[in-house]
């Protein structure tokens, strides 16, 4: 019987995009404050939605802090709620 040729594994490709920089670390922020609107706006899209971790490069704990701060700022009417879709 004839032996089957061995398959070799494909080389592992490098990631297509470089790792995102952590925005909070680059800003030098240790605590997130809901009153700091200018910093919180960097984590909100133009429609008012909270940007995902994939986009911002934050850790899980930092993303939770940002989300809580944005929600508190919305309650205090410092930031807008997400805009509804135009019809």
From Swiss-Prot:
InterPro entries: Ribosomal_bS18, Ribosomal_bS18_CS, Ribosomal_bS18_sf. It comes from the Bacteria. GO terms for biological process: translation. GO terms for molecular function: small ribosomal subunit rRNA binding; structural constituent of ribosome. Part of the 30S ribosomal subunit. Forms a tight heterodimer with protein bS6. NCBIfam families: S18. Binds as a heterodimer with protein bS6 to the central domain of the 16S rRNA, where it helps stabilize the platform of the 30S subunit. This is Small ribosomal subunit protein bS18B. The lineage of its organism: Bacteria, Bacillati, Actinomycetota, Actinomycetes, Mycobacteriales.
